[in-house]
């Protein structure tokens, strides 16, 4: 999903007039899934721009990758892993049928459910129905994705993508060890008192030039029968410098020749546990809610909003995308992580060698850092963001 880090860069640039001064959480996977469904009905420049942003050479390759991610994300609860639910929906005006090839492609690659609603006569009721679907898909962490007035009698189709994640750490932190400490804000703006989780257990840590990476695996039952392993981890990328977050994120986004920087993450992942010295990371709870059109334009997606070529989606007048709305929430604490996200695309007319033990590593996340929640086998980035003030949501 090459779009992940380039979107993070765009969102950061939007904060504080380009100062990047706010916390951030979003779901690359939710946005990727929703845009992939739109791509299944696109042609011409619209198709070219969407494929480039999503990092796919063709529509078939994109559909194949989406199907592989869907298989990798099949709920892990039965195998002792995190609970993961991912769903897509197509909500079309009931007087306009979806084209059969588009409907079948969306169902085959994205498991997208199709529902006919009455945008023309009762757009408010349709909005409530879509919001109820999102609330159910996200365990009510996100109770609404479409605000009042977002759909109208002109709405022809809404594409939704929702994800829910709930995982416990492989080694949970002890609550009694959590204590207040200073977290340093950006640009010398002082400190805040934050709740820091602590442990003396060995950790997956890798030290690189200018930053460190911490991997925190989620619990998984290795003995449980399953067709393929599903492993989830959170990665925290901590710059050495207290004000180093922006340059680190620029470095990540630039990696891979515009491919989005996921290669940067995979190349710097820790591979073994090391003894820790001083270790503490803050608890945090973040949320995000906005239109992501500006960010998508920033990564080269323009035609779909202007002269959209989307003739393969629905009968009658071709559509254009009028808005893309995204919401995300995440909470990280001693037990693990609970997170959810939803995206709505609104469209209307128009081992034998044993090396010596590595040195002991400190990992003190007392200044701004980036984080990712990743499914290891597919590399899918479920959630991404950064923390600049863990006391604010």
Curated annotation (Swiss-Prot):
UniProt-annotated stretches for the region RCL: 336-360
InterPro entries per record: Serpin_dom, Serpin_fam, Serpin_sf, Serpin_sf_1, Serpin_sf_2
Iron-sulfur recorded as keyword: no
Annotated positions for site Reactive bond: 350-351
Keyword annotations of the record: Protease inhibitor, Serine protease inhibitor
Xref: SMART domains: SERPIN
GO cellular component: extracellular space
One Gene Ontology MF term: serine-type endopeptidase inhibitor activity
Family, similarity comment: Belongs to the serpin family.
Domain notes: The reactive center loop (RCL) extends out from the body of the protein and directs binding to the target protease. The protease cleaves the serpin at the reactive site within the RCL, establishing a covalent linkage between the carboxyl group of the serpin reactive site and the serine hydroxyl of the protease. The resulting inactive serpin-protease complex is highly stable.
Role this protein plays: Probable serine protease inhibitor.
Listed name of the protein: Putative serpin-Z6A
Organism: Oryza sativa subsp. japonica
């Amino acid at each position: 999903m090459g779009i992940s880090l380039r979107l993070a860069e765009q969102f950061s640039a939007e904060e504080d007039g380009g100062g990047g001064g706010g916390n951030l959480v979003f779901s690359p996977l939710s946005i990727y899934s929703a845009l992939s469904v739109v791509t299944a009905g696109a042609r011409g420049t619209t198709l070219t721009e969407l494929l480039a942003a999503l990092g796919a050479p063709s529509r078939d390759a994109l559909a194949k990758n989406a199907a592989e991610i869907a298989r990798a994300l099949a709920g892990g609860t039965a195998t002792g892993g995190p609970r993961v639910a991912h769903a897509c929906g197509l909500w079309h005006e009931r007087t306009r049928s979806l084209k059969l090839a588009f409907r079948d492609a969306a169902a085959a690659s994205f498991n997208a459910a199709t529902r006919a609603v009455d945008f023309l006569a009762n757009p408010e009721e349709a909005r409530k129905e879509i919001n109820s679907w999102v609330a159910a898909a996200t365990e009510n962490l996100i109770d609404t994705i479409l605000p009042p007035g977002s759909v109208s009698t002109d709405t022809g189709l809404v594409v939704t993508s929702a994800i829910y994640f709930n995982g416990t750490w492989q080694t949970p932190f002890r609550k009694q060890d959590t204590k207040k400490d200073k977290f340093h804000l950006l640009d010398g703006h002082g400190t805040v008192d934050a709740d820091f989780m602590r442990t003396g257990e060995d950790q997956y840590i890798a030290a690189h030039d200018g930053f460190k990476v911490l991997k925190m695996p989620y619990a998984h039952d290795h003995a449980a029968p399953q067709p393929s392993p599903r492993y989830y981890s959170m990665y925290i990328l901590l710059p050495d410098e207290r004000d180093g977050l922006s340059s680190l994120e620029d470095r990540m986004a630039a990696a891979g020749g515009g491919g989005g920087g996921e290669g940067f993450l995979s190349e710097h992942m820790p591979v073994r546990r090391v003894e820790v010295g001083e270790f503490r990371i803050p608890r945090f709870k973040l949320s995000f809610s906005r239109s992501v059109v500006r960010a998508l334009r920033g990564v080269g997606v323009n035609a779909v909003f202007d002269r959209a070529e989307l003739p393969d989606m629905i009968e009658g007048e071709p559509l254009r995308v009028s808005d893309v709305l995204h919401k995300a929430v995440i909470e990280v604490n001693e037990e693990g992580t609970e997170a959810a996200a939803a995206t709505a695309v609104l469209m209307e007319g128009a081992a034998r060698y044993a090396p010596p033990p590595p040195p002991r590593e400190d990992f003190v996340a007392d200044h701004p850092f980036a984080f990712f929640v990743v499914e290891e086998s597919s590399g899918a980035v479920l959630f991404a963001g950064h923390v600049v003030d863990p006391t604010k949501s």
